[in-house]
């Protein structure tokens, strides 16, 4: 199993249990789904719920949302306007370029070329994006973006993360 973590905060952002696609060698697209589940409910494969005794007087709470967000404890954040988002992107890209120059100098030019196209595209879709930090809620780290796409007539949540802001860990 692979888990992608924020290089600056160490927060888990997503894993390979989802469909992951790399776009322009700079952006991961992670395809999730909307789920509802009971809090504290552990479901075991092969268990027969009808054979279990019903517990009386217990109330169960449910949570619903995008599975990637819930499973990796991402926290929604926001930008007041496109200008604030642009400022974040510029500052974050400077941090990534500095890190790339230290760790992978050969990737800097490809990154700079491809990221400009991706950033322009993101800014054009600003109103359609939701924003999430990792569990630590450190806004100095990666802020993932979430959008909904129509795929085969279904609204599918897609989490967008900058490749160079992540490190891959194998378990």
From Swiss-Prot:
Gene3D superfamilies from the UniProt entry: Metal Binding Protein, Guanine Nucleotide Exchange Factor, Chain A
GO molecular function: calcium ion binding
Name of this chain's protein: Translationally-controlled tumor protein homolog
Function: Involved in calcium binding and microtubule stabilization.
Keywords for the protein's UniProt record, in alphabetical order: Calcium, Cytoplasm
Highest taxon above the source species: Eukaryota
Subcellular location(s) of the protein: Cytoplasm
PANTHER family reported in the protein's UniProt record: TRANSLATIONALLY CONTROLLED TUMOR PROTEIN-RELATED, TRANSLATIONALLY-CONTROLLED TUMOR PROTEIN
Domain (TCTP) ranges: 1-171
GO CC field: cytoplasm
Annotated family: Belongs to the TCTP family.
